């Protein structure tokens, strides 16, 4: 889970409450936020500061700043309950978006008269970086730019340019102008995120005079650098997924509004941002009590809803719940039930002993998986853990596989275009992991043990006709890797955990012909290994040879 370090005085100031260490340690965990450490540190002026380190659940990105965390705590403690309304003032600021295939979605907002100081600036920068990881997937899905609005002139243009078309001074360089191509070759951030630029097309945001605000997702310009004296902040979010871009903008502007900032709209190709209109969901009182094992009346439930920063109206056995725009974690009614449980008070729930005595033990398959993990680590591999949800592009298209829709399970209403399909294989996700880590040194040896989900029409035990299959997969990349290296690692694993296996030549679209073998046990195929085809390597935007294997455990 991501962690954030928060100045205790700043937290008290925003929470409108004096906080003892005991209160912090007792109350924050009850609202789902773990307290890792309370400590002292010396700031750059030599003064001691009381700090608190919190662990934040990934589903609460609005808690990744002191502003959002304090807002949630005020509600939890009953200081300010109900939905917090944020007024958005109209403006004539416009942004023209020209065609941009690399990062097609963009949203802007202006927050004026922010009460800025060193603490606020530090909090804002930390929130920006945490959101880059939590939602932006290290800027792959989205990137955030925050600018001193007073340094530029509207209107603005978001467009793609060639690598040598313009020059500007990037953040971190005081007076050295560079072209976009020079930035990705020389600048620290440019080198780190150069893999996000495609086909020598560089997205830029420029103002009326052609001054460069930003080259997303790489770097901002020095011209609009935010300082403790800045007060009017222009925020831009660019990315590959519209919903994530808009939700991230809402989180940031609402955090800055906690610093007395005034939110001002920006017209982006005819659409006004930000849109802070609350969402709504209907949920029955009966279903809430059934899930929580309680017998709460509507008034008690509404009180808990209001403490969570939402509003609710009771109507014919149901609650109509208003959800603020900065809450992107309320996807289903079960999420509302969790919020009600938290704000009713976990300490009020009573545990019940089961009527039948049972003795637990570790599942035999899990024991085997644990032993496999130890062996792979002993062979020099690093273990990774990916989500079971993926997408058709990663699982099939990049692997050169032709698969019909009936052969995999697709999510009806996915929260993200990257998480639309339940994975049927682990190896493609390992290649994606190598892509994410391509800027690290070689060799890289990774493995994963996890569930894949397949359709089984002959399954008579469930109504879904689906079942989980436990698999293990591994991948190695470096300039000299070859078939023998992956055969050696796979063989060591098989000799330890499988008996009476044999290899046969195998033609697999993702592997080089003649350099792939399938693993046979009891006359059934249980896995394969070999050298990844160069076309697949390029599909994942990788550069060095890769070998890999995948074996079905159960």
Swiss-Prot record:
It catalyses: tRNA(Phe) + L-phenylalanine + ATP = L-phenylalanyl-tRNA(Phe) + AMP + diphosphate + H(+). Its cofactor is Mg(2+). NCBIfam families: pheT_arch (TIGR00471). This is Phenylalanine--tRNA ligase beta subunit. GO terms for cellular component: phenylalanine-tRNA ligase complex. Residues 276-351 form the B5 domain. Belongs to the phenylalanyl-tRNA synthetase beta subunit family. Type 2 subfamily. It is an enzyme of class 6 (ligase). Mg(2+) binds at residues 329, 335, 338-339. Keywords: Aminoacyl-tRNA synthetase, ATP-binding, Cytoplasm, Ligase, Magnesium, Metal-binding, Nucleotide-binding, Protein biosynthesis. GO terms for biological process: phenylalanyl-tRNA aminoacylation. Tetramer of two alpha and two beta subunits. It is found in: Cytoplasm. The lineage of its organism: Archaea, Methanobacteriati, Methanobacteriota, Methanomada group, Methanococci. The keyword Repeat does not apply. SMART domains: B3_4, B5. It holds the Pfam family tRNA_synthFbeta. InterPro entries: aa-tRNA-synth_II/BPL/LPL, B3/B4_tRNA-bd, DNA-bd_dom_put_sf, Phe-tRNA-ligase_IIc_bsu, Phe-tRNA-synth_IIc_bsu_arc_euk, Phe-tRNA_synthase-like_B3/B4, Phe_tRNA_ligase_beta2_arc, PheRS_beta_core. Its EC number is 6.1.1.20. One of its GO terms (molecular function) is magnesium ion binding.
């Amino acid at each position: 889970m991501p962690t954030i370090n928060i100045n205790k005085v700043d937290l008290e100031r925003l929470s409108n409450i004096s906080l003892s260490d005991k209160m912090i340690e007792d109350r924050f965990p009850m609202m789902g936020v773990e307290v890792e450490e309370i400590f002292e540190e010396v700031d750059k002026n030599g003064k001691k500061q009381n700090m608190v380190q919190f662990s934040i659940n990934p589903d609460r990105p609005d808690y990744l700043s002191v502003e959002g965390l304090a807002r949630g705590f005020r509600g939890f403690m009953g200081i300010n309950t109900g939905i917090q309304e944020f007024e958005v003032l109209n403006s004539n600021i416009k942004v023209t978006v020209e065609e941009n295939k690399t990062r097609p979605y963009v949203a802007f907002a202006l927050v004026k008269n922010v009460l800025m100081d060193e603490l606020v600036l530090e909090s804002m920068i930390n929130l920006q970086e945490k959101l880059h990881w939590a939602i932006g997937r290290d800027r792959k899905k989205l990137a955030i730019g925050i600018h001193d609005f007073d340094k530029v002139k509207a209107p603005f243009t978001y467009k793609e340019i060639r690598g040598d078309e313009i020059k500007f001074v990037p953040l971190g360089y005081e007076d050295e102008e560079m072209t976009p191509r020079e930035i990705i070759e020389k600048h620290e951030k440019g080198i780190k995120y150069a893999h996000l630029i495609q086909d020598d097309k560089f997205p830029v945001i420029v103002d009326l005079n052609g001054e460069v605000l930003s080259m997303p997702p790489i770097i901002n310009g020095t011209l609009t650098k935010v300082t403790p004296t800045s007060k009017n902040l222009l925020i831009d979010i660019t990315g590959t997924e519209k919903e994530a871009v808009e939700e991230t903008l809402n989180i940031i502007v609402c955090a800055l509004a906690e610093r007395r900032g005034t939110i001002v709209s920006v017209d982006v190709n005819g659409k006004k941002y930000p849109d802070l209109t609350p969402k709504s969901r209907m949920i029955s009182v009966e279903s809430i009590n059934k899930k929580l094992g309680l017998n709460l009346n509507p008034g008690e439930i509404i009180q808990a809803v209001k403490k969570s920063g939402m509003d609710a109206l009771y109507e014919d056995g149901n609650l109509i719940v208003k959800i603020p725009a900065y809450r992107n974690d309320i996807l289903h009614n079960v999420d509302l039930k969790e919020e009600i449980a938290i704000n009713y008070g976990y300490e009020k729930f009573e545990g019940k002993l089961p009527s039948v005595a049972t003795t637990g033990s570790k599942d035999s398959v899990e024991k085997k998986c644990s032993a496999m993990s130890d062996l792979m680590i002993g062979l020099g591999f690093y273990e990774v853990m990916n989500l079971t949800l993926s997408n058709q592009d990663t699982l099939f298209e990049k692997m050169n596989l032709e698969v019909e829709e009936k052969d995999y399970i697709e999510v009806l209403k996915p929260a993200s275009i990257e998480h639309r399909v339940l994975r049927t294989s682990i190896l493609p996700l390992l290649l994606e992991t190598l892509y994410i880590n391509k800027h690290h040194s070689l060799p890289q040896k990774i493995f994963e043990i996890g569930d894949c989900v397949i359709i089984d029409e002959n399954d008579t035990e469930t109504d879904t006709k689906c079942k989980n299959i436990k698999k293990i997969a591994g991948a190695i990349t470096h300039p000299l890797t070859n078939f023998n290296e992956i055969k050696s690692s796979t063989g060591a694993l098989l000799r330890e955990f499988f008996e009476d296996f044999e290899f046969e030549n195998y033609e697999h679209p993702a592997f080089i012909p003649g350099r792939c073998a399938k693993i046979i046990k009891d006359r059934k195929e249980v896995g394969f290994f070999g050298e990844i085809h160069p076309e697949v390597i390029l599909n994942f935007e990788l550069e060095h040879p890769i070998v890999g294997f995948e074996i079905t455990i159960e």
